[in-house]
């Protein structure tokens, strides 16, 4: 169940980040509201995850996968450009997250 919580947290973090970009500095009501609601849900489920998984694995997975998925959203929805260094860095993040989850410590 903790990984379900983590998936929900990561997903709502990515949604919240997309809303945040769309809110244009909180000047648009609906995207601003979406940002607040999404991040509220995100942190609720992140805290539920931390009740079951170690902080180091939880946070590294949340931050790493959130960054990767946010990058994908920024490319697809906002038409932002990336370069080779960005791609290599994302691959390294994925390798790090997978390694932590396979070989990292548990309680």
Curated annotation (Swiss-Prot):
Q: Where does the sequence pass through the membrane?
A: 26-46, 57-77, 84-104
Its primary localisation, in coarse terms, equals: membrane
Give the UniProt entry's GO cellular component terms: plasma membrane
Q: Which GO terms describe its molecular function?
A: amino-acid betaine transmembrane transporter activity; antiporter activity; choline transmembrane transporter activity
Q: Does the keyword Cell membrane apply?
A: yes
Gene Ontology BP annotations: glycine betaine transport
Location in the cell reads: Cell membrane
Pfam families xref list:
Multi_Drug_Res
Work out whether the entry's keyword set contains Ribonucleoprotein.
no
Which protein family is it in? Belongs to the drug/metabolite transporter (DMT) superfamily. Small multidrug resistance (SMR) (TC 2.A.7.1) family.
Q: What does this protein do?
A: Multidrug exporter. Is implicated for the resistance to bacteriocidal quaternary ammonium compounds.
Protein name as catalogued: Quaternary ammonium compound-resistance protein QacC
Origin species, per record, is Staphylococcus sp. (strain ST827)
Q: Which gene encodes it?
A: qacC
